[in-house]
From Swiss-Prot:
Gene name of the encoded protein: adk
Name the record gives this protein: Adenylate kinase
Location of region: NMP: 30-59
Known pathway: Purine metabolism; AMP biosynthesis via salvage pathway; AMP from ADP: step 1/1
Species this chain originates from: Mycolicibacterium smegmatis (strain ATCC 700084 / mc(2)155)
Domain notes: Consists of three domains, a large central CORE domain and two small peripheral domains, NMPbind and LID, which undergo movements during catalysis. The LID domain closes over the site of phosphoryl transfer upon ATP binding. Assembling and dissambling the active center during each catalytic cycle provides an effective means to prevent ATP hydrolysis.
Cellular compartments annotated: Cytoplasm
Length: 181
């Protein structure tokens, strides 16, 4: 099963991706983890990404796409994967579609974890990070909405919404149900 998880910061995507990965026996692929691993391992893609990050620049989408493509070609992802934090734009969604088509496959589902802005504020402020002020959090939500609304339209035929409010196990059960599990 090949799944994309969408949702605002604090919606619980990472937590649910871990649980789904364990239950379904497929890897969770997070772009943040990919960057850290490739940089730590000193891979050519990691070194290229590090040059941008060290200069304080955003890593170009094309490089992120190459990292994801390299990761989905690993043996443990042959039967599927859960993408957490990718794609972030319609352009990346198109690149992912092309990657999968080149491998004679496609996405099975796109889950959007939905949480109210008030709930997200409560969750994110509860993490205790110094930079999680109301203003910063609201800006991150605004950026997420601006980036993601076009993605929701792009994936409208495959999109399933998951109410991400409630106990972890309740949300997990809803996610599994949305995947037909």
């Amino acid at each position: 099963m090949r799944v994309v998880l969408l949702g605002p910061p604090g919606a619980g995507k990472g937590t649910q991706a871990e649980k789904l990965s364990e239950k379904l026996g497929i890897p969770q692929i997070s772009t943040g983890d990919l960057f850290r691993k490739n940089i730590g391992d000193g891979t050519p893609l990691g070194l290229e990404a590090k040059r941008y990050l060290d200069a304080g620049d955003l890593v170009p989408a094309e490089l992120t796409n190459r990292l994801v493509e390299d990761r989905i070609d690993q043996p443990d992802a042959a039967e599927g994967f859960i993408l957490d934090g990718y794609p972030r734009s319609v352009e990346q969604a198109g690149a992912l579609k092309d990657m999968l088509a080149a491998r004679n496959t496609k996405l099975d589902a796109v889950l959007e974890f939905q949480v109210s802005e008030d709930e997200l504020l409560t969750r994110l402020k509860g993490r205790g990070r110094a930079d999680d002020t109301d203003e910063v959090i609201r800006n991150r939500m605004k950026v997420y909405r601006e980036e993601t609304e076009p993605l929701l339209e792009y994936y409208r035929d495959d999109l399933k919404t998951v109410n991400a409010v409630g106990a972890l196990d309740e949300v997990f059960a809803r996610a599994l149900s949305a995947l037909g599990q």
